[in-house]
């Protein structure tokens, strides 16, 4: 996208030091990355880190320093405040270039046992055998997210610039296993079929635009294809790799660590013999070429003409060595 003139912004309202986020977003090519430290400032960040398990204390700090901001829901930055910050950056963008933002929210993150005065539970699971407090808290948090997302869509509905928004969940919440067992119709999660085990980790995604796009309902699609689908929907020039993934998704719409599903809905475990072995082997080699075989990477496949990828950093080389070592241990 940078080769096509886009400026890029990343927002994750949590600590930047975790998982080396600053280095990661820089290596991914983002022009700017905003984390919790940038929102709070250094002194308040230290206070937050020291009292992270006490949402009422944190709310008091926010009330003193950011009165009326609605910054927190429980102990995390709310989706409403997050979206306001996203809109603020959009409004202050370089208007001479197209704009791309990648935003990982924090509002609904676990755990789900701590009470907070700034959170009101409003949604409850029905038709279940007992009360599940964690599930109810998470369901109520989703309602807050729905309201915040509605506000974001309403804002960009009134923006003249053509805009595409993709919203997706990165993982399922850590709630009561009994609740999950009930809604999946099994006595114990250890009794799940491979297909049920895979469906347990499904999350929804939604693509919206403030102009007419082709409406469609996609039954299943694994996350390795999602970025290519968004680029295609937005009319952005695709790399050969993006095109390859979109074609692969028509054959195997789901590929994940549990197995894969073909276009007819047939499920395969990785240990199964299937008619797709050669296709998957080819995919693995292409992935390896892109991620690890940097000296021989096919630039015409993975990048738009005119873009030069960043050189490998020392940390990347160390990470590759560690991965190889881990694989040797696993194979031993």
Where are these regions (language model features)?
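Solvent-exposed soluble domains appended to multi-pass membrane proteins
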Residues: 1-332
């Amino acid at each position: 996208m940078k080769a096509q003139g886009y400026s890029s912004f990343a927002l994750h309202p949590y600590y930047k030091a975790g998982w080396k986020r600053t280095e990661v977003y820089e290596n991914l090519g983002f022009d700017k990355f905003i984390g919790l430290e940038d929102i709070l400032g250094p002194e308040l960040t230290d206070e937050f880190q020291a009292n992270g398990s006490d949402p009422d204390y944190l709310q008091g700090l926010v009330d003193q320093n950011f009165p009326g901001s609605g910054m927190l829901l429980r102990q995390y930055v709310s989706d409403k405040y997050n979206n306001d910050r996203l809109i603020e950056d959009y409004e202050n963008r370089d208007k001479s270039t197209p704009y791309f933002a990648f935003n990982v929210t924090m509002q609904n993150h676990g755990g789900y046992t701590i009470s907070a005065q700034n959170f009101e539970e409003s949604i409850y699971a029905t038709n279940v055998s007992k009360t599940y407090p964690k599930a109810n808290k998470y369901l109520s948090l989703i309602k807050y997210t729905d309201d915040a997302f509605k506000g974001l869509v309403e804002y960009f509905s009134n923006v003249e610039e053509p805009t595409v928004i993709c919203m997706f969940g990165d993982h399922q919440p850590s709630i009561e296993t009994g609740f999950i067992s009930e809604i999946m119709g099994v006595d114990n999660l250890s009794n799940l079929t491979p297909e049920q085990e895979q469906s347990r980790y499904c999350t929804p995604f939604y693509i919206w635009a403030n102009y007419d796009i082709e409406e469609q309902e996609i039954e299943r699609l694994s996350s390795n294809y999602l970025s290519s689908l968004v680029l295609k929907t937005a009319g952005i020039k695709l790399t050969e790799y993006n095109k390859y993934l979109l074609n692969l998704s028509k054959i195997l719409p789901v590929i994940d660590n549990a197995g894969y599903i073909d276009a007819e809905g047939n499920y395969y475990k990785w240990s199964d013999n299937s008619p797709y072995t050669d296709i998957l082997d080819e995919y693995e080699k292409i992935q390896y070429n892109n991620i690890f075989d940097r000296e021989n990477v096919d630039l015409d496949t993975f990048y738009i003409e005119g873009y030069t990828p960043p050189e490998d950093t020392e940390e990347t080389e160390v990470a590759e060595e560690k991965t190889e070592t881990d694989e040797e241990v696993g194979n031993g």
